[in-house]
Design a protein with these regions (language model features):
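Positively charged, polyanion-binding regions of nucleic-acid-associated proteins
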Residues: 418-458, 508-547
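Conserved Class I SAM-dependent methyltransferase catalytic core
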Residues: 87-99, 103, 195, 335-397
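Active-site-adjacent loop/helix micro-motif of nuclease/hydrolase catalytic cores
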Residues: 637-641, 655-675, 697-698
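Active-site metal-binding core of divalent-cation-utilizing nuclease and nuclease-like domains
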Residues: 576-579, 601-653, 664-666
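Nucleic-acid modification enzymes, centered on SAM-dependent nucleic-acid methyltransferases
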Residues: 1-34, 38-300, 307-339, 377-380, ...
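Interdomain/boundary linker segments immediately adjacent to catalytic/signaling cores
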Residues: 535-537, 551-622, 779
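Charged low-complexity interaction tracts in eukaryotic proteins
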Residues: 411-425, 460-521, 553-576
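Domain-level recognition of nuclease-like catalytic cores that cleave nucleotide substrates
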Residues: 693-779
């Protein structure tokens, strides 16, 4: 199950528990399906599904996901297609090697002007080709890419029969649709299309071949903007690339649930079973589904999904490319409108769609709307939900680890919240920053702000206006430019890199733990999911669910701190038991190192009974015979003090508070809460003993959060990489001054004045007594 399906499975959990006779009474509907994610999620919850594909290519994609062909059968069918059209595939793409003169098949020609490819004597500026003879001699085909002197690709007008077939395929399409391909490409594509029409393959295999040919045609189309360099890819090469991509998809595809059947007949929804009905989206499909739901009271719609956004130009290009596979229809205008980036257009189209699907709303399904991270789209979606009498919550998503998106969920019968009062923009943004707990850009706050604004409008009975709401969101995105800098003591202040934060006293007192701490815990949970071999996508969905979210750099750093990707598969760097074992071993090393440096040591009571190497940590502590209570404990919050992993101290001198972290890294909790409750003075030093893999994450968080960096400085914190504890232990006679050479992210390349232990009375040789300091004997 991919991440999109995992997210929908989680969304279905509340719906699947509503009181009905059986789960077979439940139906999920995707009105703009681009993949089979909802069908897979529904099968996991033992529900049926109806998927309305946006266009032909999406319909073929969904069919290939839910009923994938075997790789061997697909390869055989693709090879037969290539063989059938082999003569036409070679025409116009034959040349010879400039080095050895052997015949080669050109894979692509480069043109400085895309339209030059159709000139009878046009000369390309480069070519791509591979010479088998040269490659056998170790030249790697490099000479084959060298053009012949004054080389001109063979061109010529299309034969009348070919031209007639091409014109018939693009009848009714936009003007110039066939001109997206050169004459050479048209001749080969016509041969492939004709071969596909004559194919006797099964429906499943035929759909896979149609999808492959359409993808190849879209990949080699001429650029729409004039004046751009264009590589005219040979159809045989484009088709081989598309076949290879499809083969990899089928090889890596996860098994489809055995109970998931696929049909194109809506009447199948009235039969028991966990099947999926896949049809082409449009007015006819929506009307038929609404009629079926109206006439079949036993069917209850649990979830209604709509996808907004994308590229309307891309949708048009796909529809034109699909004509080579026999698809003549154009995309539904309502679905095209949903791919706009205009708030008014989206709100109008989505509102019409919800009205048309009113029979499906009888049992108050969960409405799930996926959209791009775009203010106009967000304004349009929330406006449409407002017009339908509801309000929505917004979550972030990363379905592919690269492209951010948003998901709006709503139940249209949900009553308005009680007691919500209209608030100013600054006041609402301040509360969002307070809840987030760390500096953030207004753009990151936009989804949470929009959802809060929509809830307030719903509570007051106000209907959102798409255009005005979009303008308001644009103002919020530009809020940084309107704020004053730090030192103004305003509710909100402007920081570097376009971020904002709170500076008012009331807001500072209410600041929550940084949201990055919660995200770090979610990233760490991924390790456990990977160990168990399940729930990986669910863990990633939880990591990205915060509507405010985090920067891509921080997200990447968190994932890299605990996991790595090898051959496209994510693996944990270390298991959770191994991390805990390492943490306890480091704590034991500190407790043994302290007495060798002439220090007393104590350990957190929660760790005292834990055994390491056959000896408990509590047995490694040394107590001052005169004062058994560690320094500053009586002046501190007892619970916070006792939570410190290890304390190394010398009575009358100073204290080393040591926190050992191997994962997760709750740096906000440590700096802003636990150690804020522990008394301090000028001789207190705090050491964060950190696993090396977490060091980049710590550095990034300190650099991006002024509150954390200020607490780091004021608390006299210093970084000690965990592997340096063993290095110190290997010294014959370790001293506190030796500690300085091991501090920092990359010791010994550090700021020389990072920690001056000598000025605090720490760097005294044994047997020496500094002036004015009473030396207490150690037991």
């Amino acid at each position: 199950m991919d991440r999109s399906a995992a997210r929908l499975t989680a969304a279905l959990a509340p719906s699947a528990t509503s009181p009905v006779a059986t789960t077979q009474d439940h139906l999920t509907v995707d009105l703009t399906a681009r993949s089979g994610a909802l069908a897979l999620a529904s099968a996991h919850r033992q529900l049926r599904s109806a998927l309305h594909a946006r266009d032909a290519m999406d319909e073929w994609t969904i069919a290939a996901e839910l009923r994938p062909p075997t790789v061997r059968a697909y390869e055989a069918a693709a090879a037969e297609l290539l063989a059938t059209a082999s003569e036409a595939l070679d025409a116009g793409w034959q040349s010879s090697c400039a080095a050895c003169g052997q015949a080669v098949r050109v894979a692509a020609w480069r043109w400085e002007e895309a339209l030059d490819a159709d000139q009878e004597r046009g000369q390309p500026t480069a070519r791509r080709a591979t010479c088998a003879a040269c490659r056998a001699l170790g030249r790697r085909g490099g000479d084959a890419a060298t053009m012949l002197p004054n080389e001109v690709p063979s061109a010529g007008l299309l034969e009348p029969a070919v031209r007639a077939r091409v014109d018939a395929r693009f009848a009714g399409a936009v003007d110039g649709a066939a001109a997206r391909w050169s004459t050479r490409q048209l001749r080969s594509l016509d041969a492939l299309s004709s071969a596909l029409e004559r194919s006797s393959e099964s429906a499943v295999m035929l759909g896979a071949l149609r999808l492959t040919l359409s993808e190849a045609a879209a990949a080699m189309a001429r650029p729409q903007r004039a004046g751009r360099t264009w590589w005219e890819v040979a159809p045989w090469q484009a088709l081989l690339d598309a076949i290879d991509a499809r083969r990899r998809i089928y090889l890596t595809a996860q098994p489809v649930p055995s109970q998931l059947t696929m049909s194109s007949d809506l009447s199948a929804l009235t039969y028991p079973g966990g099947g999926a009905v896949v049809v082409r989206g449009g007015v006819t499909a929506r009307t038929s589904l609404a009629t079926l739901i109206t006439r079949t009271p036993a069917i209850r719609v649990a979830l209604l999904r709509v996808t907004v956004g994308g590229s309307a130009d891309e949708l048009s290009d796909r529809a034109i490319a699909a004509r080579w596979s026999g698809e003549q229809s154009d995309a539904d205008p309502l679905l095209v409108a949903l791919q706009s980036n205009d708030a008014v257009t989206i709100a109008s189209a989505l509102a019409r769609l919800l009205v048309a699907m009113n029979p499906l709303m009888r049992h108050d399904p969960l409405v799930v709307i996926d959209l791009d991270d775009h203010p106009e789209q967000l304004a349009g979606v929330l406006t449409a939900i407002s017009l339908a009498g509801g309000t929505g919550s917004v979550l972030r998503r990363f379905d592919d680890d690269r492209t951010p998106g948003l998901t709006v969920t709503a139940r249209l019968s949900e009553p308005p919240a009680i007691g919500l009062q209209p608030r100013s923009q600054i006041s609402l943004m301040s509360d969002l920053v307070v809840a987030h707990g760390e500096p953030v850009t207004p753009r990151q706050l936009l989804p949470a702000y929009a959802a809060a604004r929509a809830r307030a409008a719903h509570a007051s009975g106000e209907l959102l206006d798409a255009a005005a709401f979009a303008d308001e969101l644009r103002d919020v995105a530009d809020l940084h430019a309107k704020l004053r800098p730090a030192g103004s003591f305003d509710q909100l202040i402007a920081l570097a890199e376009g971020r904002i934060f709170v500076e008012g006293r009331a807001e500072r007192e209410r600041l929550a733990t940084p949201a990055a701490d919660r995200a770090d815990a979610a990233a760490f949970a991924l390790v456990g999911a990977l160990e168990a071999g399940e729930g990986v996508d669910e863990a990633l969905v939880a990591l990205d669910a915060d509507p405010i979210g985090m920067s891509p750099e921080l997200r990447s750093a968190m994932l890299d701190a605990y996991t790595s990707v090898v051959d496209g598969v994510r693996h944990p760097l270390r298991t959770v038991p191994a991390m805990e074992e390492e943490r306890l071993a480091i704590a034991a090393g500190l407790l043994e190192l302290g007495p060798r440096m002439g220090l007393h040591v104590s350990v957190a009571p929660a760790l005292a009974s834990t055994a390491v190497a056959g000896r408990t940590l509590g047995a490694r502590t040394t107590v001052d015979p005169i004062d058994s209570s560690p320094p500053l404990r009586l002046r501190s919050d007892r619970a916070a003090y006792d939570a410190v992993d290890a304390v190394l101290y010398r009575r009358g001198r100073a204290v080393l508070f040591c926190e050992v972290v191997t994962g997760p890294l709750p740096i906000g909790e440590l700096l802003l809460h636990r150690h804020a409750l522990i008394a301090s003075d000028r001789e207190v030093v705090r050491l964060l003993v950190l696993a090396p893999a977490l060091v980049p994450l710590l550095q990034l968080r300190l650099a991006r959060d002024e509150r954390l960096s200020a607490a780091w400085e004021s608390g006299n914190w210093h970084l000690l990489a965990a592997d340096r504890v063993a290095a110190l232990s290997r010294l014959a006679a370790p001293r506190l001054t030796d500690l300085e050479g091991h501090l920092g992210a990359e010791p010994p390349a550090r700021d020389a004045a990072q920690l001056d232990l000598g000025s605090m009375g720490w760097g005294v040789e044994r047997g020496e007594t500094p002036e004015g300091v009473n030396r207490e004997p150690l037991s």
